[in-house]
């Protein structure tokens, strides 16, 4: 069967500043919390990553050669404002002007994110977005970038508000490494959504000609037994933590009664309270209809069953399949032993979950306008033999997900593009350099790029816009 994607569809590749650039201490860049945290807690650092800071002309030439017409890039906040606010770093500004010019030279449209997990250390150490002062600093940084970089037509404020809060305060694998604090998770999500809303309102008030949105990671949640009300509730509660709380803030400007009932239940079981103010909701209401697009990062779905025990989360960071555990008191337990394939990192491969998630957005948040799939891809332990990388599993993964995107477009959803994670191999926040996602293999010792088999497949896809399934 042949499925076709629209003629104006973006076939993109995604990157992130800290995961790709390297150059973490040169040309005036300020520190981020990850710099010290990686040295203290992991077996790798962000040096040299993919050395995108110096190699970007090569990467963009490859993008053009292989038919990629869009790229997700994030600006490193601390490369513009080393302390998060105050004095501007001219060398950082010049770098991004050069980078965006190179994008346009190669006919690759930059979709630019302002924050991709990398708050400057000077602000992170003061509480990051748990501190409401950080909202002011982020909005000032955003306003500066909107004005300074008119060559950017597509902006996103944040990448994955959900996983930021989860990583920092639930799983505890992101700095500051706090575990099982659900109140901090929700408060971080809420405050970051306020920062998004203020930046969004500012962008529209200034009447900039481009478009602006936000990127959410949206793993679909299913009950292990759909006929068991307790399992259904477990899936709904996990969905509130990871998806619905931030989606309500984005498109409703408030938290629905059902969402807040779930939040109150979770906090009653786990402790803590939230600081939600009337003026917060005035701001969210002012912003809810201004998003030009929603970016969805989708990798996996989860199956939940009811659970009465204590919270325990074990993160599988080394690709040892079966090493994960995820159970939250009063919420539920994720079950990995279901009839669905999974990666070595226990990520469940379920393309139907992307279809279901998009249709949920269409039904529950009809003001969404349009969607880009801003990240999707397969983490794999690729091997390079004489410059050849056969990654058929990645091709199959991408093909399956693009097929359901074609289906969901046929069902009436407005999906305008797809950005594979990642354009080239980058370092993974909590998995290091062994977990590769790129279309282009990076030899991290030499920084030489090698197109994988998937790159040639993607090139053909971009040319024909058809998928054979």
Curated annotation (Swiss-Prot):
Molecular function, one GO term: 6-phospho-beta-galactosidase activity
UniProt pathway: Carbohydrate metabolism; lactose degradation; D-galactose 6-phosphate and beta-D-glucose from lactose 6-phosphate: step 1/1
Family designation: Belongs to the glycosyl hydrolase 1 family.
Family matches, as PANTHER family: GLYCOSYL HYDROLASE, LP05116P
Positions with a binding annotation for D-galactose 6-phosphate: 19, 116, 159-160, 297, 428-429, 435, 437
Record key words, sorted: Glycosidase, Hydrolase
BP-aspect Gene Ontology terms: lactose catabolic process via tagatose-6-phosphate
Residue positions of the active site: 160, 375
Superkingdom as given in the UniProt entry: Bacteria
The protein's name in its UniProt record: 6-phospho-beta-galactosidase
Gene: lacG
């Amino acid at each position: 069967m042949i499925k076709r994607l629209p003629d104006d569809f973006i076939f993109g590749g995604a990157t992130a500043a800290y995961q790709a650039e390297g150059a973490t201490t040169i040309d005036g860049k300020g520190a981020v919390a990850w710099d010290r945290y990686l040295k203290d807690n992991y077996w790798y650092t962000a040096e040299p990553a993919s050395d995108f800071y110096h190699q970007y002309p090569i990467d963009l030439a490859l993008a053009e050669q292989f038919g990629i017409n869009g790229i997700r890039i994030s600006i490193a906040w601390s490369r513009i404002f080393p302390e998060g606010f105050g004095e501007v770093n001219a060398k950082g500004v010049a770098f991004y002007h050069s980078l965006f010019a190179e994008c346009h030279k190669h006919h690759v449209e930059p979709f630019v994110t302002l924050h991709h997990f990398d708050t400057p250390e000077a602000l992170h150490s003061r509480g990051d977005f748990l501190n409401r002062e950080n909202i002011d600093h982020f909005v000032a940084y955003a306003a500066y970038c909107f004005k300074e970089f008119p060559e950017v037509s597509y902006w996103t404020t944040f990448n994955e508000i959900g996983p930021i809060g989860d990583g920092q305060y639930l799983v505890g694998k992101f700095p500051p490494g706090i575990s099982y604090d659900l109140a901090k998770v929700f408060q971080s999500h809420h405050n970051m959504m306020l920062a998004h809303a203020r930046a969004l309102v500012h962008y529209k008030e200034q009447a900039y000609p481009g478009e602006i949105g936000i990127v959410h990671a949206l793993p679909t949640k299913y009950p292990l037994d759909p006929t068991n009300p307790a399992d259904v509730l477990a899936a709904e509660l996990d969905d509130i933590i990871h998806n619905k709380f931030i989606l309500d803030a984005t498109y409703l400007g408030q938290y629905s009664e059902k969402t807040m009932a779930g939040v109150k239940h979770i906090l009653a079981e786990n402790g803590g309270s939230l600081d939600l103010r009337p003026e917060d909701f005035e701001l969210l209401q002012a912003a809810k209809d201004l998003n030009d697009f929603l970016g969805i990062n989708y990798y996996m779905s989860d199956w939940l069953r009811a659970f009465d025990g204590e919270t325990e989360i074990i993160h599988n960071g080394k690709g040892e399949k079966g090493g994960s555990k995820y159970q939250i008191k009063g919420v539920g337990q994720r079950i990995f032993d279901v009839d669905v394939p999974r990666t070595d990192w226990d990520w469940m491969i379920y393309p139907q979950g992307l279809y279901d998630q998009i249709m949920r957005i269409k039904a529950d948040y009809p003001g969404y306008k349009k969607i880009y799939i801003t990240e999707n891809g397969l983490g794999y332990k690729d091997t390079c033999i004489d410059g050849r990388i056969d990654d058929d599993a990645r091709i199959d993964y991408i093909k399956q997900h693009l097929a359901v995107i074609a289906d969901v477009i046929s069902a009436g959803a407005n999906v305008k593009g797809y950005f594979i994670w990642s354009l080239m191999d980058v370092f993974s926040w909590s998995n290091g350099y062994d977990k590769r996602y790129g279309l282009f293999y990076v030899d991290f010792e030499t920084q030489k790029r090698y197109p994988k088999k998937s790159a040639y497949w993607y090139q053909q896809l971009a040319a024909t816009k058809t998928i054979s399934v």
